[in-house]
């Protein structure tokens, strides 16, 4: 029997068909020229249903206008009707496609949520890292500390991992907190993954740990911490003390009574062929 199916079955047994899991995450970014950008992501997961909504608030006027203004965008996967909906809450518009249409497109959704076009940071740095010489990479210094004790973070007992990377480009400081209490997290991830798989697609996973990804790219050996990340901070500073700061934090994850309206589009929204 497929191991993944067994795990998901156990999760479903523990989480009643009369309930759903609601997750709220907040990300804050402060970068040169861009300024402050805050993103709130809310996820809803129940048997056969998954919804994700992202609200972006950009502080600087010119950057906000260049991005098309502050946004509130989302998508809904409905396993019972086999449909996928994307919507723009600000414009009160939505578009819909069936799973059959996606299957005919090799498992790739045709309708795109405009949220996917917004790169919330980090891309330019990857390019700079790829352009570094081998000599510069060898000069980098790495320091990683894993706390023995646990801290209480967002209602979870979590272990803190601190990673410092010092190079000719400056200093990168990453702090991450991991919990091994992962039942609700796994349920949300499996619901989304199974719905995506049902139309022949493959769910894109966010990196489990940003520090581990960077250490792997640098071919450094490191000790991994098990569990689910519930918070991280990342700061980058160059020799001029100019820098980039990003904070991501789980605000809440709860099992609540099932609410059908959480997986339905608002009646006031207008149906369109695709979002602008």
Regions found by a protein language model. Name each.
Residues 3-15:
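Sec-dependent N-terminal signal peptides
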Residues 19-276:
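Extended soluble regions of mature proteins
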């Amino acid at each position: 029997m497929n191991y993944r199916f067994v795990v998901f079955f156990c999760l479903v047994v523990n989480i009643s068909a009369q309930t759903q899991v609601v997750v709220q995450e907040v990300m804050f970014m402060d970068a040169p020229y861009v300024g402050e950008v805050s993103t709130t992501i809310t996820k809803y997961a129940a048997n056969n249903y998954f919804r994700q909504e992202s609200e972006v608030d950009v502080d600087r006027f010119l950057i906000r206008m260049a991005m098309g203004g502050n946004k509130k965008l989302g998508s809904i996967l409905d396993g019972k009707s086999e449909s996928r909906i994307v919507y723009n809450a600000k414009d009160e518009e939505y578009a819909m496609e069936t799973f059959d249409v996606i299957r005919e497109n090799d498992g790739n959704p045709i309708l795109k949520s405009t949220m996917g076009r917004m790169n919330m940071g980090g891309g330019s740095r990857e390019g700079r890292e790829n352009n570094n010489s081998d000599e510069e990479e060898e000069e980098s210094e790495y320091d990683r500390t894993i706390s023995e004790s646990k801290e209480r973070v967002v209602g979870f007992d979590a272990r803190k991992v601190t990673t410092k990377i010092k190079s000719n480009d400056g200093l990168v400081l990453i702090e991450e907190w991991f919990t091994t209490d992962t039942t609700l997290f796994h349920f949300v991830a499996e619901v989304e993954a199974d719905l995506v798989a049902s139309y022949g697609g493959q769910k894109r996973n966010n990196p489990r740990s940003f520090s581990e990804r960077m250490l792997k790219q640098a071919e450094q050996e490191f000790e991994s911490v098990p569990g689910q990340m519930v918070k991280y901070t990342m700061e980058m500073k160059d020799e001029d003390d100019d820098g980039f700061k990003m904070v991501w934090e789980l605000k809440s994850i709860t099992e609540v009574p099932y609410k059908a309206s959480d997986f339905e589009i608002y009646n006031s929204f207008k149906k369109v062929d695709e979002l602008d």
